[in-house]
């Protein structure tokens, strides 16, 4: 059931509170004053620029959608929306560069505490602190919904709110490898169900031997520089990733296990599992499981899988049930696409963080109040929500007689996708069930729910200031070694790992670990564990 804003705050009290909140937010001059009637003055037209992740679309569909959407935004809040894309090529670097560039044109920022450096960028001053009065006034529906779930506490740093969680949207974002069940069955794997890493070896080799026109896994190593090392560790150890404290681009720090999550470790330094993983990658490299120049390749593995020219792709569960399986059923009939998720052997799967998707307001925004008003509409207004997420009805999507989402005849995701990538405010109350999603979606989610554990690090904020130099030095070491290990480019991976460990020690590994453990101990105490 949709939630509605309760009683209106008295106009005089709200106006006074807003004056104080704006001073607290750095004294920015507001173009959105609140009148005696309690309404916001939106007489000045403003352009709101939202930073999103993904390759900028070129098919014209997003532009057409924005034209329709901006008509509504102009009518409701006298604003229009513009999208700025951080494209997938070198996105980890470019995203942070964009945020810290001082660009005054940016307003709404797509962020996350696990994969988009939300805490780091908060600490570096990239985001504007958001007072509760500000949120109540300019994003009232969002404020009420998040408050009803008591989730603002996950968005606070030094007792101030810095972003808005996408906390009312159901998804599983645990990663794994997508593969063809028909080929897996032909390779001798029972029912074509890969249930352990070793069976990937069987599958890849069969594809290599029997499908000469196919690259078993045409990995885009330039973008996925860690390859399957992290997945192997997830499946072959009890370690659990500690989100938001990556070293460079890599999920380096982990908890010992779900039963001992508050003891910090790193399998890259303290376990033999990385030796085993790198030996398998060496074998796969020698066998030609990926292309020789994999580390320089940045092609679209997913489209290759849809075209039948590669036998695997890597991403998360939601991608599987919303895109991979339905597209493979249509484009590679009988392929029986399946997913081997990391941690299948040992049920090492956590539920997503509530801040896996979130929205922040840029610290350099020239009109943060109007940005919040636009965001509130995108997240809660049905017409705006459908446009930003689905496009134009009758062109990008249609509603079936039973109220489900479908696409017009001839629509092809590869060519006609909207790609607005609004991943920071999706809302289960306004989601429309997609008829093209895999029919087994509910069963897959229900299965995860039987064993997936709550992520123990929701709300963990790590202060890296005292070890920033050491973390940077460690990042340089990992950038040198991890891609080469991940794609089997070292003739003697054990020697390379030992050398990497020596360099990480010299870079300050022990100091960083000690600092992180102190943060973890404080966090454990704060949540009463």
Where are these regions (language model features)?
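Extracytoplasmic/secretory soluble proteins
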Residues: 3-14, 18-529
